[in-house]
Amino acid sequence: ALESQLCFALYSTQLAMNKLYRGLLRELDLTYPQYLTMLVLWQRDRQTVSEIGEQLYLDSATLTPLLKRLEVAALITRQRSRQDERQVEIALTEKGRSLREQAKAIPHAAGCAAQCTPEEAAELRDALHGLRQRLDRQ
């Protein structure tokens, strides 16, 4: 039955999380993938497209249009690497850095909406990371 499938539980939960984040991110004018990209850059500014893609499990064909939209919004800059012309480096603008303050409340708001304690959220996150790592080894 559909309800007994792990893949469906993950899929339907992802849909619900995306809907939740869509509402939370509306005031920041970011999509969920754009928010994840900004999280990566807030953690460490100035990264190549391939470094960002590695962390988000996205290929450059998917990431490039997303980065172009962030550039149009003046949140990032895209520039060819001086060391390697094949690489494009992504850096936050001042506007992109300042958006971090507004975004700080989002994880807490998502946790409240999911009605998870911080411990439950951490346990679930760790279990999902473990599952993904095992699947990546296949």
Tell what function each PLM region has:
Residues A1-L28, A122, D126, G130-Q133:
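N-terminal leader segment of winged-helix/HTH proteins
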Residues T31-P33, T48, T93:
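Residues that mark the N-terminal boundary/hinge immediately upstream of a DNA-recognition element
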Residues T37-M38:
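Short alpha-helical "packing" element that flanks the helix-turn-helix/winged-helix DNA-binding module
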Residues N18, R46, K68-D126:
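Charged, amphipathic alpha-helical coiled-coil/dimerization segments
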Residues G53:
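The alpha-helix within a helix-turn-helix
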